[in-house]
Amino acid sequence: MKTILVAVDGSEPSLKGVRAALDLAKGVGARLELVYVIPPVLLPPSTYAETIKKLEEANATMATHALDKAKAIVAGAGSDCDLITLHGAPAESLADLAQAERVWGVVIGAKGHNAVSRVLLGSTADRLMHICQKPVLIVR
Amino acid sequence: MKKILVATDGSDASLKGARVAFQVARPFDAAVTVLSVVPPIVLPGDAPWAPMDEIHLSELKRGERVLSETLAALGETALNVSTRVMLGPVAETITEVAESGAFDMVVLGSHGKGAVKRVLLGSVADRVMHLCTRPVLVVP
């Protein structure tokens, strides 16, 4: 069975993306995989190791929280899904995973947490559009 | 998912897009509008003898031909399908139709007939992505 990747970062558009992905999955007969990408922590090498560890823990907590919220929506619709956490640059990681044979396409919110309010399309969605070789649904 | 808009220019990617749109529409019994937008011909101002109306009429006919070819390629369907040909700037016209008709999803080919092979995302898809406030599915 084919799967549809849903990019989740806990933001409102990404949760809307989950709902849209449920519809799309019903149409193309696919199962959902919710994906959270933890961006690399970029700090100067002199940073106290404990600080980096704490940041990484905080990131992992955020990932679990966002995935659980998204999974609740899928469960509410009477569906099941898999949860995936990746580490790396968000758009690139999603595009790489989308290369897998099982993947039909990717659903992503137009803007995540970091976008400026006046832009319609955030940088991750924009970049994913340009590098992904499978269908991409942008949800607003 | 009640109304789906598909934009087509007769390219392979847009035909694939139309297939996906029909597939998604089926379980929801959604209405599908297949739209072909022909760009206005721009001639230098010192060509006043050019029969613009006739040129545009023949361009609109070309759009209709693209639509009938697309529908023929998709074969018979039980879906509620309508078609529309419009003359205007392509991305802007698709966006305008999507928003005024409150479509639940807009489906586009990632690149049409004009795009260079090596680019993954054509200019029309890119522009619609940035302009449109409805969910957009780009199919490669």
PLM regions and their residue ranges:
Chain B
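Small/aliphatic-rich secondary-structure junction motif
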Residues: 2-50
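Short glycine/serine/threonine/alanine-rich loop segments
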Residues: 30-31, 79, 103, 134
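Conserved beta-strand positions in the Rossmann-like core of class I SAM-dependent methyltransferases
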Residues: 33, 82, 137
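Short secondary-structure boundary segments
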Residues: 36-37, 109-111, 140
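Short, hinge-like loop/turn segments at secondary-structure boundaries
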Residues: 49-53, 100-102, 124-125
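A short acidic, glycine-rich active-site loop
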Residues: 51-65
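Structural beta-alpha unit
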Residues: 72-106
